[in-house]
Regions:
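Cleavable N-terminal export/targeting peptides
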Residues: 1-24, 198
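A broad helix-preferring feature
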Residues: 8-15, 28, 57-59, 119, ...
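Transmembrane beta-strand segments of Gram-negative outer membrane beta-barrel proteins
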Residues: 21-33
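Surface-exposed strand-loop-strand hairpins of Gram-negative outer-membrane beta-barrel proteins
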Residues: 32-58, 137
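Charged, low-complexity C-terminal accessory regions
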Residues: 32-34, 99, 126-132, 165-171
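Predominantly the C-terminal beta-signal and adjacent terminal strand-loop region
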Residues: 38-40, 47-48, 79-83, 144-198
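Gram-negative (and chloroplast) outer-membrane scaffold detector with strong preference
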Residues: 56-142, 150-152, 188-197
Length: 198
């Protein structure tokens, strides 16, 4: 009897370990929209705002979870370009403005939906390298997201992600005319992703 009990305990421990701590790799596709960055304080220009343009971001991530908590490392690429906007104009120059970013995130599960879906909240810093006319601008931002994850089949899962980001202005002082005021650059995005459990 003691041998059977020991065998059951060992079997339970070995099967619970992969569930308790799991590695995932993932692919994300997100629609991003930027705001802030610079504003015409004189109201003398038709286009009163200058900012990164809206773009589609492609990302890869590696994450590790322990039951309720987790960490992730994410890298992404997009080409937002440079946008100028006003009341009756919205122009985007896509010949410049490549964006590379890498972020570290911590997350926690805040709710469950259905038998195996989960809602997580993620927070962390990100480093952005915005290549503006051949000059790479490095900015550190704060990002936060709400993520809904659900199983698709076997080891494959899906995710919907709503993200917000705040960063110092992506323009340097010499990039904008004197009548333009530099402001915080902000971004929000909506994305879909796939997660594969290793």
């Amino acid at each position: 009897m003691r041998t059977l009990t020991t065998a059951l305990v060992l079997l339970t421990c070995t099967t619970a370990r992969p569930i308790a701590a799991q590695w995932h790799i993932g692919f994300d596709l997100a629609a991003t929209r930027y705001g802030g960055s610079s504003h015409d304080t004189s109201n003398s220009h038709v286009a009163s705002q200058g900012r990164p343009g809206d773009a589609t971001a492609v990302g890869l991530r590696v994450s590790h979870t322990w039951r309720r908590y987790g960490v992730a490392l994410r890298a992404a690429y997009a080409k937002p370009g440079l946008a100028v906007a006003g009341q009756s104009v919205n122009l985007t120059d896509k010949t410049t403005g490549d964006l590379f970013e890498i972020g570290a995130l911590v997350n926690t599960r805040v709710a469950g939906i259905g038998p195996s879906g989960a809602v997580r909240v993620e927070l962390g810093p990100a480093l952005h390298l915005w290549n503006f006319d051949g000059d790479a601008r490095a900015r550190v931002s704060a990002q936060g997201a709400a993520v809904y994850e659900w199983p698709i089949t076997g080891r494959l899962g899906g995710a919907v992600r709503l993200e917000g980001l705040l960063s110092p202005c992506w323009f340097d002082a010499g990039d904008v005319p004197p009548e333009f005021e530099r402001r915080v650059t902000w971004r929000y995005s909506v994305g879909l992703g796939l997660r594969y459990r290793l």
